[in-house]
């Protein structure tokens, strides 16, 4: 009985003293960076809203772009159908999240637990943070005559744009090591076209302002950057070399055992 009561105390002492090993530090960094991103991004979103509402050049850009693209949509109904397919099916947030979920399952089967955790936390944190900022800012969507599409909820930031940013970044950084070097530029182009294309469809369909889309991109990049820094810190803890975006997040994913078991240091 005495041993049972002393074990939790020892565990608590280890947590307080910080001697928890690289895996525990990795989890702590993930939570810390996600919280820091939320604290930084919400004031940024509010500041951006103030700029949008008070700075005439940005307001003119929002309204003129919306009016021109809406006029083009009314003149080309076939193009509207293409845009709706892209935004509601191919690039829908549900589609993006399912792709990330499939990636997480595959990574777990490969034994890449930390990379799977990074992917899941990045996607989840991005979605929750975007929803939080939407409700904090509570910006109305564009109101255009004869709308060609409608969308529920608030406008800033664009959830489609943010989900595309986080999802494409997760898929790209996780899978890039498996792509032949000569095809990696094509993978980057495909990801960029997807992210930009998602933003275009939302503005062209009249359900978002340009600044909404820009806000979604920026917030998504902030989340990816924060969680990626946490992952890189874990790699440094276990003695792995620092990677670059061109290499992908974990080049070892190509090997049979991409990560050491939890609690076991990496072999030199």
Predicted segments with their positions:
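Transmembrane helix-loop junctions in multipass membrane proteins, especially transporters and channels
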Residues: 53-57, 111-112, 138-143, 207, ...
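Membrane-embedded catalytic cores of phosphoryl/pyrophosphoryl-handling enzymes
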Residues: 146-257, 264-266
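Hydrophobic alpha-helical transmembrane segments
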Residues: 31-35, 97, 116-121, 185-192, ...
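Alpha-helical membrane-inserting segments
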Residues: 43, 47, 129, 133, ...
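N-terminal transmembrane-helix/juxtamembrane module of multi-pass inner/ER membrane proteins
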Residues: 1-95, 137, 141-148
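Membrane-interface loops
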Residues: 66, 97-99, 104-186
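Alpha-helical transmembrane spans of integral membrane proteins, capturing the lipid-embedded, hydrophobic core
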Residues: 37-42, 89, 119, 123-127, ...
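Actinobacteria-biased recognition of intrinsically disordered, low-complexity terminal regions
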Residues: 1-34, 230, 234-268
């Amino acid at each position: 009985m005495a041993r049972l009561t002393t074990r939790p105390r020892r565990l608590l002492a280890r947590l307080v003293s910080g001697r928890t090993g690289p895996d525990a530090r990795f989890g702590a960094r993930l939570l810390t960076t996600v919280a820091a991103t939320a604290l930084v991004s919400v004031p940024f979103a509010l500041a951006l809203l103030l700029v949008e509402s008070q700075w005439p050049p940005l307001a003119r850009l929002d309204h003129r772009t919306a009016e021109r693209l809406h006029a083009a949509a009314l003149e080309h109904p076939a193009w509207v159908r293409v845009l709706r397919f892209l935004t509601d099916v191919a690039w829908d947030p549900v589609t993006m999240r399912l792709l990330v979920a499939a990636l997480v399952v595959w990574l777990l089967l490969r034994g890449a637990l930390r990379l799977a955790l990074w992917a899941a936390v990045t996607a989840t944190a991005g979605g929750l943070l975007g929803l939080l900022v939407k409700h904090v800012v509570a910006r109305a969507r564009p109101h255009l005559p004869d709308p060609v599409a409608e969308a529920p909820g608030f406008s800033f930031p664009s959830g489609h744009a943010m989900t595309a940013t986080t999802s494409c970044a997760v898929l790209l950084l996780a899978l890039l090591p498996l792509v032949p070097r000569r095809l990696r530029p094509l993978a980057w182009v495909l990801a960029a076209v997807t992210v930009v294309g998602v933003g275009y469809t939302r503005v062209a369909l009249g359900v978002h302002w340009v600044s909404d889309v820009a806000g979604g991109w920026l917030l998504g990049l902030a989340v990816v950057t924060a969680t990626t820094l946490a992952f890189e810190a874990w790699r440094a803890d276990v003695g792995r070399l620092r990677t670059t975006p061109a290499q992908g997040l974990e080049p070892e994913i190509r090997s049979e055992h991409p990560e050491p078991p939890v609690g076991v240091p990496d072999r030199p």
